[in-house]
Amino acid sequence: MTVKLGDAGSGEEGLKKLGKRTADEESLDGEGPGGADAADSSSTKRDGQTPRASGAPAPPRGLPTPSPPQGSPQDQHHFLRSSVRPQSKRPRKDAPCALGSGGASGSGPRGKGSDGGASSSGNVSGATPATPAGGSRSSSRNIGSSGPEKEEGKKVRRQWESWSTEDKNTFFEGLYEHGKDFEAIQNNIALKYKKKGKPASMVKNKEQVRHFYYRTWHKITKYIDFDNVFSRGLKKSSQELYGLICYGELRKKIGGCMDDKNATKLNELIQVGATTVRYKGRNLRIKAPMCRALKKLCDPDGLSDEEDQKPVRLPLKVPVELQPRNNHAWARVQSLAQNPRLRMIVELHRKVSSLIEFLKQKWALHEVRIRKTLEERQLQGSSTVQTQEKVALHLFPGENCTLTPLPGVARVVHSKAFCTVHWQEGGRCKQGTKDIHSLPPAQILGIQSGQGIARGQLKCQRSSAEGKGGGRLLPTADASQSSGESSPESAPAEGAAPSLSSPDAPDRPHGLQDSGPHLEKTPVTALAVGRDSPIQESGALPCPCGQPPDLEDELSLLDPFPRYLKSCQDLIIPEQCRRADTRSGREHPPLGSVASPETLTPSSGAVADSAPPGLDPQPGTDHQPDTRLQSDICTKELANASSEESQEKGSPSEHLSSQGQPATRPSKEVPASQLAQQLREEGWSLQTSESLTLAEVYLMMGKPTKLQLEYDWLAVLGPESQAPTAQGQTALSRSSPSALHQQRLLSCLLRLISTEVHPKMAFEANTASTASVRPTQEEQSTTPPGKVVTINSRSPRCSRNPSTLRSNKTFPSASAPCSPGLRNPPRPLLVAGPSSTGSSDSDGGLFAVPTTLPPNSRHGKLFSPSKEAELTFRQHLDSISIQSDFFSPKPKKLRKRHLRKPLVVQRTLLPRPSENQSHNVCSFSILSNSPIAGRGWFRPIQSSLTKAALSRPIVPKVLPSQATSHLPSAIDLAAQSAGIIPGSPLPILDTDGSSGISPLSSEQATTAISGQGDTGPHQNRDPVTAVRGTNDPFISVTRPEQEPMTDGFQGSPALTLPELSKANLQNGLSIPLPSSESSSTRLSPPNVSALLDISLPGPPEDVLSQGEPATQISDSIIEIAISSGQYSEGVPLSPAKLNGSDSSKSLPSPSSSPQPNWIASPTHDPQWYPSDSADSSLSSLFASFISPEKSRKMLPTTVGANSGTSLLGPSLLDGNSRDSFVSRSLADVAEVVDSQLVCMMNENSIDYISRFNDLAQELSITEPGRREVLFDGGGGGNPVGDLSQ
């Protein structure tokens, strides 16, 4: 026999022999420890061959069950002490057992028998309760107690048979690590022995380990209650392993002694996952360990690797990008004057529901806000019915993102540096060790079988059902699978699943009965119930019953107009008609709700069954209005309540998994792709995402750089309408018809106010009437964002076309076509364009310009929740369109964004506007070196503070028509073209930025000029075309060559205005000199020209604010500042004031030109200074140009004629960049230049023209090598001449 001890074959023979033992032998031996173990082995062997239901004791074991003596610790210790039982207490019948199992390696006959029995009893939990405690105890304590009696050699091997405390600890360590892998446990024990230097002969072998495993299991099975959830749907091996692991924890804390008290604690530990034991005067908290064996048990497929078990560190915040899911969602947000594309940075530990709540408030329709304020003043009885919206905001994963189902998340920890996700371990879920005690082991092992573990259960404490319900749709499939169901054992799981929710479940603990299935089923009921009954949708908004035309409209409640049209039908359509329509509406599930065909049938049953008895849903689809009126109850509460009640009633809705499939179908069959598809269809709503954090979504999407989510408004699923708590709502809904009628009246009044508030009523009414009768328009909800639909709203990919923008904005919105899909609310926040652009340019035709203030602005709260709210609204019906001017579209006010400034040809010091009037100044530059004619151009000088002209290049659209006899001079013409002469209207350019400037066409410019004073065609006429290189169109006025002019100002004082203007206008308008015409001898760098563009009224800050690049013009540029004062044409400059200007005093420029100069007499423009000035001297003239701010800053320093260069210095004139002058501090430079000019102008005896030339010469000599690329084309013109000659 000794030879057979280690032999596996002998073990098998022993098992067979033990299996053949008769029942009477077992009964006789039952009182002895060996007999007890033999009975265990035989019964369990038999059970292994034919498994019985758990809890049914083996028939032959009726006698062993009541054996109390073995239960006493004294007997056990006595058996441990005695190596050989007395013959009086050991019947002789034990000999066959001893012989049969004597081959058991070191464990004696009992060891082998218990081993065989344990292996077989692994399939059944029923055999275990009958095992005598004493027998199993003695066998576990002293395995070979009866072995030595048979064979003397056994005494030597008794060391093998005894399991010391250390051995047992090692065994349980191995059990924690490897589970029911006896060889691995044996290797673990051998390794530990080897480390301690113990002889190899003391190492337990695999058979001994197996014996000990089963003996210990048999010892504890008697105390485990197998009638509870723990045993249902769970594999026998899983029960064994989990029970032994829990027993090992209990044994570690309080020892292995099992009595009734400890048995209760063991049951509590198994069922709840944690227990508190009073031991040696201390309260010990014992938790079910989350060891690798249970991990394998819960995740047999190995999906959760060891790396995955570690908490995942995620960034603290992640950018989230929200995009509309379809055109309807885009138009809804756009109509609220909000950006449909939203980017934000969110913390990952936030709940998705909080994000949805934020968006819901941010994008609340204005009528919703008004309704909320109004409902505060309405009847208490019916006001609550109206609070629920028909559409709910849902978030969806991005279109291109890949969703991978997540294992369960135990918790998301938020620290200063990281957002850490701790996994849950149960049911293919991972969990941190700290959180395992919060899960009942039954849930850890996936006892819910096919139903899966709802995320809400992760938080539920022991036997409480207060899990953070709502259940997540997301992880149900992932969490659902327990290791027990993933292999061949899924078949028993399927069978056991219905019993979970069956009415015979009361034998379970109450907390478990509720926490598992009800939390599991909460989303199921919500999905299944609400998805297929548009009744809730038709009754969710103020009207409790649906209307015939509304039904199609409310299928997609994203269209604002059906809501308003419906308000009038509330008053007209009889209630019977509405109820009839709700029946027809039942056949058409809403487009927004995506119910798979598999879901429709069960969920319909669920709707009927889950309705409370008080509701009595009607046989067809005709639910009473009362049912629809219950949509105001909190979704979560009602979903939980309905699932609880349906559990007790055993309703079919209980068997629906979160995918809408019956729970009897194991959820592991639901592939991850189907879960992802479900998420893409249903998304996350406020209710289903209550316990879902953004960290989980982030992990699900594969840790992208940014979370790309889509949003849409879907019809409210309305699980609450079939809630069991609906009796109160039923009574509420059965309120008097007058209350309902009053409610509808108030709702209609609200909508009328919303539409009447805006003067564009006719347009909206047409659109509303068209939209209400066109159900096909609802199908546009599925239109891709870029598809052109016949609506005027811009699709998300629309490009901003400035020309269509201008045309659309200028047309009154009443002229817009009544396109059914127009997504304007009754206060059109989008001004629709004309019909010509409505359909053809629907993608790019309408640039949404909010004509009313956004709802969240401080002006938007028109309706204060006062007690006289209804009276005020009725009064508004009559007068709101007149008195509320801020609802009317404002005159177009372009956004004052400082965009990239347009490129201009010269740099100017811009004036700051005075208190009452902004000086619109135009600088006129003379380029007198052209061989054809002296050319110049005008450029308007805009103040950055001038609102009307800010970032709008002034283009001469309309030139004032004047008599031919009083033709304007060139400067006057430039002033008119700049829009600064009071007689000419200031042209406003409709542009949103520099990129959209509409250039003045050549025909317009030429016609305008020639119509004013052109005497005939001229060969030098150059039409004014916008220079495309610059976004600021400018005009260059050519000077006629044929009119020579005399040297000084005083030379021809009698030259009249018409003469010069006629001559000037004969060449028409020409564009600035191209590079081919420009002379190569222009020396001044761009910064010099910036210094020379001296506009007297302008402080230097304006140049900085304009930010236009400096461009050079010529050495001898005369910047004549034209004031925008009153112009009278008949006042010439007094020659006496100009007599001091002598040609001999003018300093020559670097090169002199024989060409006639442009300024020949003071009559070139007699109106270039304010005519109301009493003193026409130069000092008073230029003093009038100085702004008050500049005059306060002026220093009365007298600067010499040659001090320009010394004051301005070469450091300010370096040509490192085109904006080198602007990039420096302009305050000192401009102060010097302005003060120098003032001194110049105050000295009447000095020719101010020569002083200008002197200053220009000194500034240009400083840097002669700089050339301007734009004008350095190499044209062979003559050099620049002195203007005063």
From Swiss-Prot:
Biased composition (Polar residues): 654-664, 766-784, 804-813, 994-1012
Keywords: DNA-binding, Nucleus, Phosphoprotein
Localization annotation: Nucleus
Entry keyword Nucleus: yes
Compositionally biased residues, Low complexity: 117-126, 134-147, 479-503, 792-803, 833-843, 1069-1086, 1141-1156
Signal sequence annotation: none
SMART domains reported for this sequence: SANT
Start-end of Gly residues biased regions: 100-116
UniProt biased composition (Basic and acidic residues): 13-24, 148-161, 505-519, 579-589
Comp. bias intervals (Pro residues): 57-71
Record's protein name: Protein cramped-like
GO molecular function: chromatin binding; DNA binding
Domain SANT: from-to ranges: 158-221
GO CC annotation: nucleus
InterPro entries: Cramped-like, SANT/Myb, SANT_dom
Biological classification of the source: Eukaryota, Metazoa, Chordata, Craniata, Vertebrata
Region described as Disordered: 1-161, 456-519, 579-673, 766-843, 994-1055, 1068-1107, 1132-1172
